[in-house]
Design a protein with these regions (language model features):
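Alpha-helical transmembrane segments of multipass membrane proteins
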Residues: 36-41, 111, 115
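Membrane-helix interface segments in multi-pass membrane proteins
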Residues: 37-83, 162
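Short helix-capping/hinge motifs at transmembrane helix termini and TM-loop junctions
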Residues: 44, 48-52, 110-111, 121-124
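Selective recognition of hydrophobic, aromatic-rich stretches within alpha-helical transmembrane segments
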Residues: 1-5, 63-88, 97-122
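Membrane-interface extramembranous regions at the lipid-water interface
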Residues: 1-32, 88-102, 118-162
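Residue-level signal for alpha-helical context at structural boundaries
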Residues: 25, 44-45, 57, 112, ...
Length: 162
């Protein structure tokens, strides 16, 4: 699964808390989310810094310029708009490892995010589980490049004359 496919899948299942999400879907979504958030944040800090440098009154605490405020507003809209998909893909990822979505609440206690991170790195439950069929397929991932090696034609015999 590519990063674009993962983002489209997560956004298409905006508030779908049932089913399972593969590791790749979860981590590609997390990477895309982090990149967009970081770019917006750096842009906001840069705009606030430029305005504070060019306008000394804007450097006073609480007197941020309009550009930085607009970008911080955009960050707020981004975080608000992606909260449900992020929550949903995390719960589906927990389902894929055979755990209830209620395990997400462990992130509310100190160091609970570490436990959630370990769960997110975990492998899928083989076959179907209580939350649905394995998104990798019944026997694991069977895409090109994975699985048992395939032999095409007859092996070449090196060193023997033909």
């Amino acid at each position: 699964m590519s990063i674009g496919t993962a983002v489209r899948t997560v956004l298409a299942q905006y508030a779908t808390f049932s089913g399972r999400a593969r590791r790749s879907e979860y981590w590609w979504w997390s990477l895309a989310y982090s990149i967009v958030f970081a770019v917006l944040y750096v842009l906001a800090i840069a705009l606030v810094g430029v305005e504070a440098f060019t306008n000394p009154e804007a450097a006073a605490p609480g007197a941020g310029g309009i550009g930085g405020l607009l970008v911080f507003g955009l960050i707020f809209v981004f975080v608000l708009g992606t909260f449900l998909p992020s929550l949903a893909v995390t719960i589906r990822r927990l389902h894929d490892t055979g755990r209830s979505g209620w395990w997400y609440l462990i992130s509310l206690v100190p160091f609970g995010n570490i436990v959630l991170l370990v769960f997110a790195f975990g492998d899928s439950t083989p076959g179907s589980n209580a939350y649905g069929p394995n998104p990798k397929g019944e026997g694991g991932y069977s895409g090109q490049g994975y699985g048992a090696p395939q032999q095409y034609g007859t092996p070449q015999q090196y060193g023997t004359p033909q």
